[in-house]
Each structure stands twice: as structure tokens, then as C-alpha cells.
Amino acid sequence: MARVLRDPHWVAVGLLTWAALGLLVAGHEGHGDLHRDVEEDFHGHSHGHSHEDFHHGHSHGHGHTHESIWHGHAHSHDHGHSREDVHHGHSHGHSHDSLHHRGHGHSHGASREAGAPGIKHHLDTVTLWAYALGATVLISAAPFFVLFLIPVESNSPRHRSLLQILLSFASGGLLGDAFLHLIPHALEPHSHDTPAQPGHGHSHSGQGPILSVGLWVLSGIVAFLVVEKFVRHVKGGHGHAHAHGHGHSHGDSHAHGHSHAHGDRHECPSKGKPSSEDEKEAGGLRKRRGGDTGPRDGPLKPQNPEEEKTGSDLRVSGYLNLAADLAHNFTDGLAIGASFRGGRGLGILTTMTVLLHEVPHEVGDFAILVQSGCSKKQAMRLQLLTAIGALAGTACALLTEGGAVGSEVAGGAGPGWVLPFTAGGFIYVATVSVLPELLREASPLQSLLEVLGLLGGVAMMVLIAHLE
């Protein structure tokens, strides 16, 4: 069974199965359009003459009416086609009444029938926090059940082909998330409703917000570049080992060697194997030289500096990806907290949408961390730490009066810079750290699977965008 799981073909089949499941869910989500249509009916604008009685009105088409109480001719601008209570709806009407009064009526209805679509079932404080935090913990823990099934333990040649496919899936997911989810939501105009007039709103749009979003995306890319350069500088100048050796050997009958090494050598913790191989090689040289077991004066030059450089680069990219994931989880937490403020049904729908989005995202992050030098357990623990960002976002949305911050994120605008800045980070990690790994020489079948994996990651983000 383990041998079958290690086959990268089965992983490709699994990704396609997941995409098919997303299509089924997307098809089912089509029923949700009915709710949106009804909601639009409540806020839309239509011209018509309504047929109303004492209890409710059903607005449709054009015509004339004689009402049972206000007997007269009415011309109204109704918002939507709906069955309403006596004063339900938002209408501007001119009525000529034969019994009581004549004149111009202007009403803003705020009441709806029990069970009408879009109603907010307000929750008490304790229940609200329990639902919101429970949903956040669910979306943070659920992907780990999928990670346990991935037969990749470390970045070793035995798992290289499968890891490359997962990396391609990760790059597609990151790019799709940035261009199809974060940036479009940041560009969406948002409206402001007042409590006195919930039906009225005005949107902000224009070149200013678009330019601002673009600048924040670029700021995210530049910020991640600066962070990576800083980390490389801290690790040792260029992020990889430098060994400048000036060897001065004085040979005699005992073959004593003397060397001077200048420069600092900084290695990742996971790079212990090359040093042990150097020691073995040095031991063999000492044996050939007559059994000299004295200490060496300086370290030997690394066998493959380019390979060590690559490993260090990837380790930095792993931490950068964690930082971007932390910010992204914060926005997810804001959306969940704000949605539960709007009602239990809206909160559950948002939670399911975020969960479908997080599963492929966490798989991609796991692949990046393993490629960066982490073991499977280390990668899972590091990903679990990013759940702190989601919990912080949920708490922020719940503590903010009226859920203003969270509502903007849930609606797509977000606190000005968070979404586009995170998108810039995702673009940097995908293009600078992950995609270059896919350019390594591989067989035609492996290359095809990697391209399919990338397209699969993008397809998942397309489905998520459709669901939202």
C-alpha cells in the first residue's frame, strides 16, 4: 500500500479528484444564486404598479390596481419582487386616495417576514465567540488530516518526484490566490450603509484605489525581497558558505600539512552530513599520510558550494512563505469573525468557503517547507503556528465595534493594505522561490505532471473564486 501511495501518478489522480469535488460543490453552490437574486430583489430598483391588499403585496409587471383599503390609483417604484407585510419594502409612490388622504408617500421599509432570506439571527456574546473561534480552529486543523496522507517525509531523492509535483501545485495555488482572490477583492468597490437608511449606500471607486492596490502589491514584493536579503546577510554575507583558503604546505618525510583558512562558514542545521563526510575524508588522508591523528587547523572547502547555496535559499523562502501565510490567515480570521456577526448561516457558509480554500493552500505550504529542509513533523508544526494569525484575526473582528474591520475584509476591501500586500508576498514566493525549482532537468512524464500540478493549483483557486 505504501508503495502505491509513493507513486506520483496517484498524487496527480488525487489532485484531479479534489478538483472534481470542487466542481460538484460549485454546482451545488449555484442554488445559492437564488438567495442572491432574492437579496437583489430587496435592494434592486424596478418600476411597476403593485397589487396590494391589507396583508401583503406582490409586485410584478405594469398595471393598475384598486386597493382594498386605500382604494385608488398607485404608481410606485418598488425594490424587488417580493411578498411583503403591510409597510414592507422601499418604495416611492404617488397615490390618489378616495377615502382618506391624497399626496406623496415616501417610505423606507426595514421589516421583513420571519424566515426571509438574508435575515440576521443575532447571537449572544458567548455563543458568537464560541462559533467564530470554533470555526477558526476547524479550518486550521482540518488540513492536517490531508497532510498525514501525503507520503513525503523529507526532501530526499526518494521523494523528489512527488515533492516536485506538490511544489508545482503550491506555485499554482499561490499565484491563483494572489491574482484571482486577493487582488480582485482588494479592487472591489465597497459601500457604506447607515443604520437609519440601510437601503442606501455609496461606493468608492476610481483610479485612486486601483493605483493604491497596485502600489501595495509592489510593496509586498519589495518587502519580501528586503527580508530575504537581510536574512542572507545575517546568515553570512550572501546566505551561503564562503571558504577562502590559502594553503601553505611544507612537505617533509612525515608529510605534515599546514593550512590557513580565511572566511566564515555558516551552514543550515540540516547540512550536517557534508561535514561528517569531510571528517571521514580527512581521516582517510591522515591514514595515508602515516596515521597522523592530530587536529586540523582549518575546515575543508565544501564539496558542492552551489548545492549548499540552493539549500540555504530555500530555507529562507520557507520562512518567507510562513510570514505570508500568517498574514493570509489573519484575513481569513477577520472574514470568519465578521460573518458570524452577520448571522450563524452566513458564518457557516464563510467557514466552508475558507476551508475549501485552505486545504490546497496548506498542502502547497507543506511542500515548500519540506523543500526548504524541514522534516514532515517540523513542517506540520510550523504550519500549526500560523493558526495564531487566524485566531488573532477572528478576535479582532469580534472585538471591533460592529465588526467594521472584519466586514470590509469579508466584503473584499479589507484594511487597505492587508490583501494586496499579502498578494505581493505570495507572488514573490511563487516566482522567486518555487518556480525555479521546477526548471530542473526532469523526464518528459515528470515535467508533464508538474505542469498539470500547477494548473491544478490554479483550477482550485478558480473554483474557490466561483464559490465566493
Curated annotation (Swiss-Prot):
Keywords: Endoplasmic reticulum, Golgi apparatus, Ion transport, Membrane, Methylation, Phosphoprotein, Transmembrane, Transmembrane helix, Transport, Zinc, Zinc transport
Residue numbers spanned by region Disordered: 36-116, 237-313
Membrane topology, from the record: Multi-pass membrane protein
GO molecular function term, any single one: zinc ion transmembrane transporter activity
Pros-methylhistidine: modified positions: H64
PTM summary: Rapidly phosphorylated by CK2 following Zn(2+) treatment. This phosphorylation is required for efficient cytosolic Zn(2+) release.
Induction context: In cardiomyocytes, high-glucose exposure up-regulated SLC39A7 expression and induced its phosphorylation.
One GO CC term, this protein: Golgi apparatus
Pfam families listed in its UniProt record: Zip
Subcellular location: Endoplasmic reticulum membrane; Golgi apparatus, cis-Golgi network membrane
Record field: transmembrane: 10-30, 132-152, 163-183, 208-228, 385-405, 409-429, 447-467
Basic residues bias spans: 237-248
Acetylation among keywords: no
This protein's name: Zinc transporter SLC39A7
Catalyzed reactions per annotation: Zn(2+)(in) = Zn(2+)(out)
Origin species: Rattus norvegicus
GO BP terms in the entry: B cell differentiation; intracellular zinc ion homeostasis; regulation of ferroptosis; skin epidermis development; zinc ion transmembrane transport
Function as written in the Swiss-Prot or TrEMBL entry: Transports Zn(2+) from the endoplasmic reticulum (ER)/Golgi apparatus to the cytosol, playing an essential role in the regulation of cytosolic zinc levels. Acts as a gatekeeper of zinc release from intracellular stores, requiring post-translational activation by phosphorylation on residues, resulting in activation of multiple downstream pathways leading to cell growth and proliferation. Has an essential role in B cell development and is required for proper B cell receptor signaling.
Oligomer and partners: Homodimer.
Listed InterPro entries: ZIP
Family: Belongs to the ZIP transporter (TC 2.A.5) family. KE4/Catsup subfamily.
Record field: compositional bias (Basic and acidic residues): 36-56, 64-100, 249-312
Keyword Membrane attributed: yes
